[in-house]
């Protein structure tokens, strides 16, 4: 793994896992297979090693979830962002496309090799896993009661984005611990789902102190 700005210019993936485990209060041994898959191989990371380790430690339990996505290009863009920030993604089926779709791969490029993806056959299957993790479900919706900038995010939140064509059904609304919206001009429907994901995840990262800074600041 190549790390831009590190003292040596190189940072072995096993060392990265050790740093991450220590940052999370775990043992100093190598990390599990999921993280190894997420960061495996050589990869350019645009941050000093110490800042990336802090970022990864804080974001290790924060997740994005996509509810029955319709458009492969949006999903590919979100997966690329998640790879860059080290955020796992839950994809809740059925999806409107195959995960090997050419359009998805075109949007995600080679970043698919660097993101942890968990696929769930249904919302019920996803909920069983989420509840076992003990993570809050934070729904991003045009029907949200609170602006995302006014919400206090937690490090283990799961940020859920609805289907492009229909959002999420009432069952999913009821399951959410919080329903957030992005303030917009009146008369306009909604933002692109990938843009919305970037805006809200960026705020969540800022709140929990995981925003990377340049060495000069």
Q: Model-found features: residue ranges?
A:
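Intrinsically disordered, low-complexity segments enriched in small polar residues
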Residues: 5-9
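Polybasic, low-complexity intrinsically disordered segments
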Residues: 1-2, 17-24
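Post-transcriptional modification and biogenesis factors for structured RNAs
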Residues: 22, 26-29, 34, 42-217
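Cysteine-centered motifs
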Residues: 15-17, 31
């Amino acid at each position: 793994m190549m790390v831009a700005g590190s003292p040596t210019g190189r940072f072995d993936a096993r060392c990265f896992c050790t740093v991450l485990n220590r940052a999370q209060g775990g043992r100093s041994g190598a990390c599990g297979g999921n993280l190894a898959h997420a960061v495996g191989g050589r990869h350019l990371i645009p941050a000093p090693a110490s800042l990336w380790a802090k970022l990864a430690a804080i974001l290790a339990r924060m997740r994005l979830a996509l509810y029955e996505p319709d458009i492969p290009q949006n999903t590919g863009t979100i997966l690329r962002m998640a790879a860059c920030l080290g955020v796992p993604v839950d994809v809740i089926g059925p999806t409107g496309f195959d995960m090997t779709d050419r359009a998805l791969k075109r949007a995600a490029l080679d970043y698919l090799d660097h993101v942890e993806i968990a696929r769930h056959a249904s919302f019920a299957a996803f909920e069983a896993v989420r509840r076992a993790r003990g993570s809050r479900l934070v729904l991003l919706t045009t029907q949200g009661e609170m602006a995302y900038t006014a919400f206090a995010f937690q490090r283990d939140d799961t940020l859920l984005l609805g289907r492009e064509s229909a959002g999420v059904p009432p069952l999913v609304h009821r399951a959410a611990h919080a329903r957030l919206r992005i303030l917009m001009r009146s008369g306009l429907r909604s933002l692109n789902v990938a843009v919305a994901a970037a805006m809200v995840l960026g705020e969540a990262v800022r709140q929990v102190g995981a925003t990377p800074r340049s060495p000069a600041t």
